Amino acid sequence: MISTRLARAGALAPKSRLFLGTRAFATVGDSPLDKKVEMANTEKGNYINYKKMSENLDIVRRRLQRPLTYAEKVLYSHLDDPHGQEIERGKSYLKLRPDRVACQDATAQMAILQFMSAGMPSVATPTTVHCDHLIEAQVGGDKDLARANEINKEVYDFLASATAKYNIGFWKPGSGIIHQIVLENYAFPGGLMIGTDSHTPNAGGLAMAAIGVGGADAVDVMAGLPWELKAPKVIGVKLTGEMSGWTTPKDVILKVAGLLTVKGGTGAIIEYHGPGVTSLSCTGMGTICNMGAEIGATTSMFPFNDRMYDYLKATKRQHIGDFAREYAKELREDEGAEYDQLIEINLSELEPHINGPFTPDLATPISKFKEAVETNKWPEELKVGLIGSCTNSSYEDMSRAASIARDALNHGLKAKSLFTVTPGSEQIRATIERDGQLQTLEEFGGVILANACGPCIGQWDRRDVKKGEPNSIISSYNRNFTGRNDANPATHAFVASPDLVVAMTIAGTLKFNPLTDKLKDKDGNEFLLQPPTGEGLPAKGYDPGRDTYQAPPADRSSVNVAVSPTSDRLQLLAGFEPWDGKDANGIPILIKCQGKTTTDHISMAGPWLKYRGHLDNISNNMLIGAVNAENGKANSVKNKFTGEYDAVPATARDYKARGVKWVVIGDWNYGEGSSREHAALEPRHLGGLAIITRSFARIHETNLKKQGMLPLTFADPADYDKINPEDTVDLLCTQLEVGKPMTLRVHPKDGSAPFDISLNHTFNESQIEWFKDGSALNTMARKSGAK
């Protein structure tokens, strides 16, 4: 059920059994919050400041005089100015002080290059870098890792030396996926973290507000500046009942994605609550929060509970769990807190779901999936099943998957489809190796990949089908846009729980329902797979495996960060030019994008990841995946000056060489997907002025602003249809003011009379400074130079 009215937590959600005691406003008294509790075992001197958070909440409560959702509590407890900050959900821009920053290696390169240009000796906020994106899956874990270390040596050496220089924790290649490492080591209840990856919200499984951002936002926080976020609305998801059988936490978010769609969470935090929460493991809650990125949510969160305490204890952080219990009344929603929208899901009635193909919000319950395959003529044969990724690679996930594989092996069966396994971290890999699940999955036919992102982000040297050949794959990943996993636009990629992935690889077909359909064993006897089983936490504790962490040295003065001037992978940054103070007249439309334009379309990953530290080289992939509304083709646009069709980046470079600015016209939810700021840096670098769309995804809109570009939306979305890609336009930049529309004057290609289109924007005063100065980094440099 979905309710779009303001919904009170107390009225619609009975008191949770997460903890005994009151859920009202009561604030925490003296002593307990004065303790010095470090936020991570890998660091010294970085403390959890529940006392400051509590004081901030007291100030905000006196001002607002109303109950708060849990999401609001975490954000407002991190306000830079709780006394003076304007607070209105969906409208105000909050200036916040995050506790931590986390960066993955593909985005960390540009973030660190930008931080270096700010001229500071060390980061002002605890920061870590995680090497997980640059390892291509080819033959298997150790060999793929060795190959990656050789190919990416220049980048890894840069990151290792830069993190040592600037007091940043460094997780080496093979350590695991950023979000699993964060959950195991850095996430803590009530904390606020930003990360340069869109699936940063994974840490919501430990009651943390963890938000994906672009590298420029990360640089601000690393430099000690407050971070700005438009105050999100809060969508409540009340969970009742209890999961059993084949239903998993993944099915909760697959269901929610189907209800809210890929843009339904934009501008909102998804807050889970209700008695059903207690039936979920901590890592299961992480799974749900992780994939909230697919519905555009700012982040997703669960309230602190005993399952989280158990996980903290299992990961050698019981002291943090004990401290959180002292602050527990503020680690959940207030009685009577209101949500902007409420969804109710009964876990006892929830079916396993499969989402896809080509979009993560096309949700189908397993009971109707066979019919959907037939109706839509999706390729029935299942070519590959893939489990793991940052979304589903916990001990519980691997244990349940192994139980299904063992059931099949006991009946003389193995995987009929190709099958891969991606452990989420070295700790997970070592633990499931010790406890036997890894051997079971290998015996079943699984190829164990490196502890890294791999096929989930397109780092997959797939060779079993030809490019352009229609085929089906199913994974426990989070994202399944066209061509994302294997660069084959004809691959039908489906997303499900690891349990369903393993079951379907046994049958080798999409038309298999393990809840009802029988298999034949080696002797031809029919049998039904048993529902999966698996412990949420290892009974023998976690095995840390190989040591893959590099702490910053005590003396950083002698560390040098070298970037070769001839490198094709790393390039020191030059500042962007400031705005010239004039309207832009007679400029071309580089491309009018038709339909879905994700960050994968704007700046592809896969083989392009190696250029993430070299802005000019990676700009050669700008918008090559976007479909041109003029001709229905990708990477084919008409040059206004030559009349010839050419690649999008080549055309943009020609315009830049002529000193001509250009704009892009986009469709709905432009820039959905990952947090990669290259999708904003590239158009800025190649001379772009504005991106004008029906609507934007949140992170991409902010990234464009940070780089001195104008993200603008049609006041009337139907005006998108009035523009011909060969028209020229005037953009009246001098009209840029807070809360006021801007004008786009269109000069039609056919010579008919010009007409005006009204454009909206979400710039505030400080963001307008970014545009005028040329970028947020330029503004930072200007202000620091003036001090």
UniProtKB/Swiss-Prot annotation:
Give the stretch annotated as transit peptide in the record, renumbered to this chain: 1-33
Q: Which InterPro entries match?
A: Acnase/IPM_dHydase_lsu_aba_1/3, Acoase/IPM_deHydtase_lsu_aba, Aconitase/3IPM_dehydase_swvl, Aconitase/IPM_isomerase, Aconitase_4Fe-4S_BS, Aconitase_4Fe-4S_dom, Aconitase_dom2, Aconitase_mito-like
Instruction: Kindly summarize what the UniProt induction comment says about this protein's expression.
Output: Constitutively expressed on glucose medium and increased expression on ethanol.
Q: Which CDD domains match?
A: AcnA_Mitochondrial (cd01584)
What is the free-text note on the cofactor?
Answer: Binds 1 [4Fe-4S] cluster per subunit.
Name the positions where [4Fe-4S] cluster binds.
C390, C453, C456
Name the coenzymes or cofactors required.
Answer: [4Fe-4S] cluster
Q: An example Gene Ontology cellular component term from the record? A: mitochondrial nucleoid
- The superkingdom listed in its UniProt entry is Eukaryota
Sequence positions that bind substrate: Q104, D197, S198, H199, R479, R484, R612, S675, R676
Q: By what name is this protein known?
A: Aconitate hydratase, mitochondrial
Q: Which organism is it from?
A: Aspergillus fumigatus (strain ATCC MYA-4609 / CBS 101355 / FGSC A1100 / Af293)
